[in-house]
A protein has these predicted regions:
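Conserved active-site-adjacent core of cysteine acyl-enzyme catalytic domains
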Residues: 43-143
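Cys-His-centered catalytic/binding microenvironment captured across papain-like cysteine peptidases
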Residues: 2-10, 25-27, 31, 108-173
Length: 173
């Protein structure tokens, strides 16, 4: 289904958080991974693109970025969601035949229907996965995550923590 959520002429659309994450739109056709990472971190996608570039990223690059940014995460071998909460998932692209598309999925089995909520970063006028997941038929590369982390991690840690960590690593055995 086409993303037809453009505001009427002369009006700005107010974006509301979805289960604690602020939806964002990818700046080009291949930055869905960067945009999902930005939503997980709670930063503008431009900051993630400045760090990781505006070219397509694969699942290995996503996993490295998750670790670099200090996001608490766990990759799963099999695709069925088993943990409540947010997941990075890869699904068939609805806009580029034969390509993959990165999405965020929230899983809460007690929330009726399929128990999932989808954040699709595809841009205006693009085919998108529905928020309720009704048109999502398959996915893979499931990575559960706890929103947070920082583009500056571990440099973004407070001074007391750095001092404590330094003391722990420089002690005698």
């Amino acid at each position: 289904m086409k993303n037809s959520s453009a505001p009427p002429v002369g009006q700005q659309r107010m974006v509301q958080p979805v289960l604690g994450l602020m939806p964002q739109t990818q700046p080009n056709d291949v930055t869905c991974v960067q945009t999902c990472l930005a939503m997980a971190l709670g930063v503008p996608v431009a900051q993630v693109v400045a760090r990781y570039g505006d070219k397509a990223l694969n699942q290995i690059a996503l996993w490295h970025a998750i670790q670099e940014c200090g996001i608490v995460a766990n990759a799963f071998v099999y695709p069925p969601p088993v943990c409540r909460g947010w997941h990075f998932i890869a699904a068939p692209s609805l806009n580029m035949s034969g390509s993959e598309h990165q999405l965020l999925m929230h899983y809460e089995p007690d929330d009726g229907s399929q128990g999932i909520t989808i954040l699709d970063p595809a841009g205006e006028g693009k085919n998108v996965y529905q928020r309720d997941g009704s048109n999502l038929k398959s996915w893979h590369s499931l990575i559960w995550f706890n929103p947070g982390g920082s583009l500056d991690w571990p440099n973004g840690m407070d001074e007391g923590r750095r001092t404590q960590d330094s003391a722990n690593t420089t002690g005698h055995l």
